[in-house]
Amino acid sequence: MRDYVILTDSCCDLSAEMAAELGVEVLPLSLQMGDRTYRNYLDGREIGFHEFYERVRSGELATTSAVNVGEFEEKMREILKTGKDILSISFSSALSTTYQSSVIAAEELKDEFPDAKILTVDSLCASLGQGLFVYLCAQEQKKGKTIDEVKTFAEETKGRVCHWFTVDDLNHLKRGGRINAATALFGTMLAIKPVMHVDDEGRLIPVGKARGRKASLTALVDRMEATAIDPAGQTVFISHGDCLEDAEFVAGEVRRRLGVETVHINYVGPVIGNHSGPGTMALFFLGSER
């Protein structure tokens, strides 16, 4: 059996330390802010996470770019030359062209590496939902599962990776076209906070609302309580848009209410945070369905 590498992208929002511990390779997406282009590395080496959110708070605007075909080809070729196969797990195709780039790159490399396997997975996930999904696949790899077995596991599992989140400022979603201007205006005036999720097709969908910040954070835990499978026995991921105190509140609630023992907290990275804004709070877990 040939050895293989799990390859993903920086929208997984894993910490650099966890990615290294899992042994996964990570390709960065890019962010254009001011007159500079930054690569969204997991360790924040080109733009720090707090720095990014402070610049957004000050009114700076940014645009983002997916991983392109050439970047995938370069990284995949580097891995294949070591004699290893590749399981590529990408940011949701409903939110980025990164997955499509991985598929094209894999096809382009087939003739050059005819004996290699390059399997691609559309995670239909985002942020630490994608991170949780990659984490689960890496755990299967560590158990000695083959690349085909982990690919099957991935396809069977991705529809149960639940993403629930809220934002603090509706204007960021308005700018990204997720809600209209009137909704943003009245929501802000009334302190309405949306409760949103990523659906079975990998799309970001508003499904409810709460009056006030604390109510919106509690609503995330309510959603987990309603759909989580064996919450006390699973690893839960939480990501935040530079609001660690709120993330710790949610972590405390899932521990208190659901008996969860293992919680990992990290930033919503700049690429996704550019669309959701400072104050984004997201909870990720395995459920019976999304």
Residue ranges and their predicted role:
Residues 46-53, 76, 81, 108:
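A short glycine/small-residue-enriched secondary-structure motif
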